[in-house]
Amino acid sequence: MLAVGAPDSFRGTTLHNSESEMVNKITVVGAGNVGATTAQRLAEKELARTVVMVDVMEGIPQGKALDQWQSAPIEGFDSRVIGTNGYEETRDSEIIVITAGIARKPGMSRDDLLNTNAGIVKQVSQQIKSTSPNAILIVVSNPLDVMSYVAMKVTGFPRERVLGMAGVLDTARYRAFIAEALDVSVRDIQAMVLGGHGDTMVPLISYTSVSGIPITQLLPQATIDAIVERTRTGGAEIVKHLKTGSAYYAPSSAAVQMCEAIVLDQKRILPCAAWLEGEYGMSGLFLGVPCKLGRRGLESIIEVALTRGERDALAKSADAVREPMGAVKL
């Protein structure tokens, strides 16, 4: 029988990232459910030597960070987790995940959060600009596409260093619902959701397959249509159940997958909200598109061929993003 505290080599645990694969510091802004869960996942994956959680609520980031750090001997990670109410501890972060903002309540759309969260993200972005001017930003706060715009506008960062977490989450929901309908592993579902992070998102049926088999050969169109609609309202479905908050397990997983692709220079093709400069015939907005992520952040935007219906739906989604963008006050 092994004693408590036996070395990992005896316990058969998986190896974590080496020092050379880590970045020095990743900051999570916001210590609510999404932020705290993101910080825990980042630490468990050892993507940074230090994970900083910053929040205006006194004691909350400190208490949650201490709790997470005390899980390190059990989970087997050495990433240090610290909590703070100021930005000095976040200085020179390589990646910053912005989750700060109020959460949705039943009956609220993501756009209902616009003015309140725009003010919060503006203030956060001003702090980031002065303390971590070389950071890569991953925006999670809603309404996602517009908050990504606010962060880029206020910091002045190039588009390569400002990304929105949207399509990774929406695609995960889409894949989960398909796997459930077919009773197969989620690992075998290949799919992609583009467009704005809202009711006009565009699940690409033409690029959806199960181990290479087109989804249209496996499910009737009515079932596919129902899954597409459930994907679009996936966040609202969770809000309705929770009543006092919104999703955080899947959103945090999505944000961390993006961080991992960047830290480990994986060259992953992930659907993210990116600033368009002519791609897909659009410019001047953040929209979910296939992005190649590496150590420099956004390395390229992949333009895929779309059906006429998908092109029209993407244009409609872009219009839905532009409207609140024009209403936001900076």
Residue ranges and their predicted role:
Residues 35-36:
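N-terminal Rossmann-fold NAD(P) dinucleotide-binding loop
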Residues 74-136:
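Rossmann-like NAD(P)-binding element
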Residues 155-161, 170-330:
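C-terminal substrate-binding/catalytic lobe of Rossmann-fold NAD(P)-dependent dehydrogenases
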Residues 6-17:
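N-terminal polybasic/positive-inside topogenic patches
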Residues 54-94, 322-330:
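Conserved N-terminal Rossmann-fold NAD(P) cofactor-binding segment
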Residues 109-175:
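Rossmann-like NAD(P)(H) cofactor-binding subdomain of soluble oxidoreductases
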Residues 31-32:
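Glycine-rich Rossmann-fold phosphate-binding loop(s) that bind the pyrophosphate
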